[in-house]
Regions:
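Extended, non-catalytic subsegments within catalytic or DNA/protein-binding/adaptor domains
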Residues: 1-231
Length: 231
């Protein structure tokens, strides 16, 4: 029942911690609880000593102030694309992987947003590409939103050109844009998983001579944000 006693909220956070919830998850839950109280006309002191002291205690027990991974910046991006181009693998696979990385970076997409794209979500226009994201992590109401990718000068690192080539070579006309290959290197109808995207990024980082342990599948998105902030 509302309003909740800060001690009860603190106990709830302890319970989540016992289920191996990360510190970032605990903080998000606390913010959400505070927002719900506000919407219902109640006040919850999320800075109450019983809550803050418990959070600090959980952080000490876990011993994990989570280390953030490095963003993939423009220079890293070019090294990744060059590493893909040098691989002795089927050209069609190179087209797919190049498009995944370039689209992920230039659009600041999450991995799950990349793999959820369908052919029907793409609208190639004179200025570039409009992408309809039907659902996203930040889209609380499931209304969807659009992202636009403009044309750039250098075609080798140009996401729209790369994606167009992938669509042409793969002959995809409906359904998932990014798909798995079978063991015989045939393109299937099955959607690629976001875990596979993370593995691909790690693979090409290693091939580019970059220490992959400092990066994650989120590095494409964070690299986009960092590059945008620095530009």
């Amino acid at each position: 029942s509302l309003p909740s006693d800060p001690k009860i909220v603190s106990l709830y956070l302890t319970y989540l911690s016992s289920k191996d919830a990360k510190m970032s998850t605990l903080k998000r839950r606390l913010v959400s609880i505070g927002v719900i109280h506000k919407l219902k006309g109640h006040y919850l002191d999320t800075k109450h000593p019983s809550i803050i002291e418990n959070i600090m205690g959980i952080k000490r027990r876990k011993g994990s102030i989570q280390l953030s991974k490095k963003p993939i910046l423009i220079n890293n991006l070019k090294e990744l694309i060059n590493a893909i181009d040098k691989q002795k693998k089927e050209e069609i696979k190179k087209f797919r992987d190049r498009s995944i990385i370039l689209i992920g970076f230039s659009g600041g997409f999450r991995r799950n947003e990349i793999v959820s794209l369908d052919y029907e979500d793409l609208d190639f226009v004179t200025e570039g590409l409009k992408i309809n994201l039907r659902r996203s992590k930040t889209d609380q109401f499931g209304e969807g939103f659009k992202k636009a990718l403009p044309y750039f000068d250098n075609s080798q690192y140009f996401p729209v050109v790369s994606l167009k080539k992938w669509i042409e070579v793969s002959k995809i006309t409906s359904g998932p844009v990014f798909r798995r290959f079978t063991k015989c290197s045939r393109l299937s109808n099955n959607r690629l998983t976001d875990q596979k995207v993370a593995l691909l990024i790690k693979e090409y980082l290693k091939l580019a001579g970059i220490d992959s342990k400092n990066y994650s599948g989120h590095s494409l998105r964070s690299g986009f944000a960092t590059s945008a902030a620095e530009s």
